[in-house]
A protein has these predicted regions:
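N-terminal accessory segments that target, anchor, or regulate ATP-driven/P-loop NTPase machines
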Residues: 1-57
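Hydrophobic residues in alpha-helical segments
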Residues: 31-34, 47, 90, 163, ...
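Walker A/P-loop NTP-binding motif of AAA+ ATPase domains
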Residues: 60-274, 279-280, 292
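Glycine-centered secondary-structure boundary/capping sites
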Residues: 23-25, 75, 167-168, 300
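AAA+ ATPase "lid" subdomain C-terminal helix
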Residues: 277-308
Length: 310
């Protein structure tokens, strides 16, 4: 229904009710029926039925990620090497078939916030020449029973359909904050997101590694200890990769990446700055460079000096 049609209907209904009351009709049953009908239609539309907008469509179509490679991610050499080794199982399909190796279904990235887990998932899609589909765990949590499970099915279906449409042999499905839906299940207590987790487990068990397009699940969390044991067992998330805070060499690498588009003066020592930022994550180091540029602009300086960054 168009916007004008809805406005006309909203204006017409009260006038009709007033007219019926004026004629002496009892409009209470009519109003009650209308409220019940509206409630049913609203619930069905929220669950994607009756031609309503589906949950995945309300969230918006997944967009291709920006160009991202492992070289664009500063530091994390150990984590990147572990991830590349796992991704080779997706690329070298003929070799792993020859040796009877069971390909991976899932990779779990763990570590503190801001260490580049999402960036590594995007780089994985580029490394394997795969379609990239992403979602956050919070998108699956709803007050309506069954909505989360439906969204899980839609997500897997979208990954496969997009890979087929774009002519790709594989798809990388990234779920951030998986602890929201993958938390430990408590006996006796039934929660809506228990159904969502059960559906995720069912979909992962249904991944046939010989099928095309092949599907790889990458999930990220900073609370690994909260995850249900059924989710992290072998055969589902086979590889657990720790993405930890960068060391000094990694911090300097990250600072160099984020300083490429900034006019640094010759006095700036990124090595010194890397030593001063012990315990900083990649996101915090990016913020340091950004704040330094803001201070330089505030001082109306031509370049960013060491004092703006320290």
């Amino acid at each position: 229904m168009s916007k004008i049609g809805k406005e006309l209907l909203v204006g017409f209904v009260p006038v009709l009710l007033v007219f019926l009351v004026f004629l002496g009709f009892n409009v209470f049953p009519l109003v009650l029926s209308g409220v019940i009908l509206f409630s049913l239609v609203y619930v069905m539309r929220m669950r994607g039925g009756m031609g309503g907008v589906t949950s995945s469509e309300r969230k918006g179509k997944s967009k291709p990620p920006e160009y991202m490679t492992f070289d664009d991610i500063g530091g994390q050499d150990r984590a990147k090497n572990e991830l590349k080794e796992a991704l080779d199982f997706l690329i070298r399909h003929d070799e792993i078939t020859k040796f009877g190796i069971r390909p991976l279904k899932g990779i779990l990235l763990t570590g503190p916030p801001g260490t580049g887990k999402t960036l590594m998932a995007k780089a994985s899609a580029h490394y394997t020449n795969s379609v990239f589909v992403s979602a956050s765990g919070s998108e699956f949590v709803e007050m309506y029973v069954g909505v989360g499970a439906s969204r899980v099915r839609d997500l897997f279906k979208e990954a496969r359909s997009r890979a087929a449409k774009e002519g790709k042999e594989s798809a990388v499905l990234f779920i951030d904050e998986i602890d929201v839906i993958g938390g430990k299940r408590e006996g006796g207590q039934h929660r809506e997101y228990d159904q969502t987790l059960n559906q995720l487990l069912t979909e992962m068990d249904g991944i046939h590694t010989s099928a095309s397009p092949r599907l790889l699940i990458i999930a990220a969390t900073n609370r690994k200890e909260m995850l249900d044991s059924a989710l992290v067992r072998p055969g589902r998330f086979d590889r657990h990769i720790e993405v930890d805070l960068p060391d000094k060499k990694g911090r300097e690498h990250i600072l160099r990446i984020h300083s490429k588009n900034k006019p640094l003066s010759g006095e700036v020592s990124l090595d010194q700055l890397a030593g001063e930022t012990f315990g900083f994550s990649g996101a915090q180091l990016e913020s340091v460079m950004n704040e330094g540029a803001i201070y330089a602009m505030r001082d109306q300086a031509e370049q960013i000096g060491q004092g703006h960054l320290s």
